[in-house]
């Protein structure tokens, strides 16, 4: 467990120790009507909103990193979700990385979060609000067992499941990434109400947070949506494949060279940075 905690901490702070990308040199949102441009892993945003860091329903972590920008739809989603959580007495929603002022590529920790439509949310709901020191150096709560096959019962709660379900039932949400063991527990607990599980997708890591992704806004004409998740609740063979040992000869994919930026994003960089 100690090794896992260290790995989680390293994941959350790694980006601070790497060289800045050009996008990190843009310190304020680019003026203009809100437009998400490109794909989630290769894009930018014009006219981003700033998530207010003061709220009765949520708290923003690591504000010193200035990653609390996004499309207005994302800001409204966070406010909507945290209000629903507050109404149900679930606790305070802890907001992690959204995007940078103009979106774009991070120097580490994320491949996506580039178009202002992604947010990481901790899977813990404190009843007592965190101090500023806790928010600046958050301690992730690893919900998954060391072998990765199930959640830790003492750390899992119906409130966490309710938070994920609330997010999945939001019309603007297209995907929620969680660890396969968390998805498995949601499948076990869901009962007959299962339509929302389609949006909850198993993915590597994501042991302590969920990564919520919104659909492209209708008026963001240069935004590239992902295909919809496959039909069904995703609780069958696809999910079980995540728990199978790697096939012999399987190797990690080579690191790919980033693709060219969408022209509008390159023009934005040319004007504001280069």
UniProtKB/Swiss-Prot annotation:
Q: Cofactor: bound how, per the entry note?
A: Binds 2 Zn(2+) ions per subunit. Zn(2+) ion 1 is bound in the active site. Zn(2+) ion 2 is bound at the dimer interface by residues from both subunits.
Q: Where is this region: Disordered?
A: 225-274
Signal sequence coordinates: 1-19
Cysteines paired by S-S bonds: 44-265, 187-235, 216-223
Q: Which GO terms are recorded in the biological process aspect for this UniProt protein?
A: peptidoglycan metabolic process; proteolysis
Main location per UniProt?
Answer: periplasm
What general EC class does the enzyme of this chain belong to?
hydrolase
Please give the cofactor(s) recorded in the UniProt entry for this protein: Zn(2+)
* GO MF annotations in UniProt: metal ion binding; metalloendopeptidase activity; serine-type endopeptidase activity
A single GO cellular-component term on record: outer membrane-bounded periplasmic space
Top-level taxonomic group: Bacteria
Residues that coordinate or bind Zn(2+) 1: 110, 113, 120, 211
Question: What UniProt keywords apply to this chain's record, in alphabetical order?
Answer: Disulfide bond, Hydrolase, Metal-binding, Metalloprotease, Periplasm, Protease, Signal, Zinc
What this chain does, per the record?
A: Murein endopeptidase that cleaves the D-alanyl-meso-2,6-diamino-pimelyl amide bond that connects peptidoglycan strands. Likely plays a role in the removal of murein from the sacculus.
Q: What does the sequence similarity comment in the record state about its family?
A: Belongs to the peptidase M74 family.
Cited NCBIfam families: PRK09429.1
Q: How does it assemble?
A: Dimer.
Q: What HAMAP family does its record include? A: MepA
This protein's name: Penicillin-insensitive murein endopeptidase
Q: Which gene encodes it?
A: mepA
């Amino acid at each position: 467990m100690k090794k896992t905690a260290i790995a989680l901490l390293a994941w959350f702070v790694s980006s601070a120790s790497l060289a800045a990308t050009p996008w990190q040199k843009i310190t304020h949102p680019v003026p203009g009507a809100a437009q998400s441009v490109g794909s989630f892993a290769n894009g930018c945003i014009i006219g981003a909103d700033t998530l207010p860091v003061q709220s009765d329903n949520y708290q923003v972590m690591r504000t010193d990193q200035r990653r609390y920008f996004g499309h207005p739809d994302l800001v409204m989603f966070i406010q909507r979700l945290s209000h629903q959580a507050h109404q149900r007495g679930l606790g305070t929603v802890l907001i992690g990385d959204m995007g940078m002022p103009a979106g774009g590529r991070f120097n580490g920790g994320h491949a996506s979060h580039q178009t202002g439509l992604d947010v990481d949310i901790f899977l813990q709901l404190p009843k007592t609000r965190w101090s500023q020191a806790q928010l600046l150096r958050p301690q992730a709560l690893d919900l998954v067992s060391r072998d990765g096959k199930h959640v830790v019962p003492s750390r899992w709660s119906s409130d966490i499941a309710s938070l994920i379900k609330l997010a999945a039932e939001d019309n603007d949400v297209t995907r929620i990434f969680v660890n396969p063991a968390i998805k498995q527990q949601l499948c076990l607990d869901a009962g007959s109400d299962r339509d929302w599980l389609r949006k909850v997708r198993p993915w590597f890591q994501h042991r302590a947070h969920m990564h919520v992704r919104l659909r492209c806004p209708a008026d963001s004409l240069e935004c590239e949506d992902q295909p919809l998740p496959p039909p069904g609740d995703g609780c069958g063979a696809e999910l079980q494949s995540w728990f199978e040992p790697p096939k012999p000869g399987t190797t990690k994919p080579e690191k790919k060279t980033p693709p060219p930026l969408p022209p509008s994003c390159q023009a934005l960089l040319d004007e504001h940075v280069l």
